[in-house]
Amino acid sequence: MSFKKIIKAFVIMAALVSVQAHAGASQFFKDNCNRTTASLVEGVELTKYISDINNNTDGMYVVSSTGGVWRISRAKDYPDNVMTAEMRKIAMAAVLSGMRVNMCASPASSPNVIWAIELEAE
C-alpha cells in the first residue's frame, strides 16, 4: 500500500469518527465564517502545498485543482502558532489524500488568506 493510500485511509477514518465532518461545510463552520469578513469557499480539491521563505512571498500556500491559490498565515505567538500549525496539517492531509476542504478565507489580500479550514467527508 502506498504512502498516499495510507494517509488517505487514515484521514477518511478520522473524518468518519469526527462529528464535524459532513458533505459540504458543517453548519458550525458556516456560522463561524459568516461572523467574519471572510468568504466561505466549499468543496475545494487541494493539489499542491508550497512552503516559501523568500522575502516578498514568505508563507505557506495551497493550490486547488482549478488553479486557485490561498495563503496560510504564519503566527509568532502561542496559541496562534498552534492553530496555524493545525491548519497546515489539515491542508497537507487534504493534498496527500485527495479529500476536499472547506475554507473561510479573507479576500482582503491576494492571494486570499485562510482563516479557517475544514476537511470535507467524501
Swiss-Prot record:
Molecular function GO labels: toxin activity
Disulfide bonds: 33-104
One matching Pfam family: LT-IIB
Signal peptide: 1-23
Keywords for the protein's UniProt record, in alphabetical order: Disulfide bond, Enterotoxin, Signal, Toxin, Virulence
Lineage top rank: taxon: Bacteria
Gene Ontology CC terms: extracellular region; host cell membrane
UniProt xrefs under InterPro entries: Enterotoxin (IPR008992), LT-IIB (IPR010503), LT-IIB_sf (IPR038629)
Cited Gene3D superfamilies: 2.40.50.50
Protein purpose: The biological activity of the toxin is produced by the A chain, which activates intracellular adenyl cyclase.
Subunit structure: Heterohexamer of one A chain and of five B chains.
Protein name, UniProt field: Heat-labile enterotoxin IIB, B chain
Organism of provenance: Escherichia coli
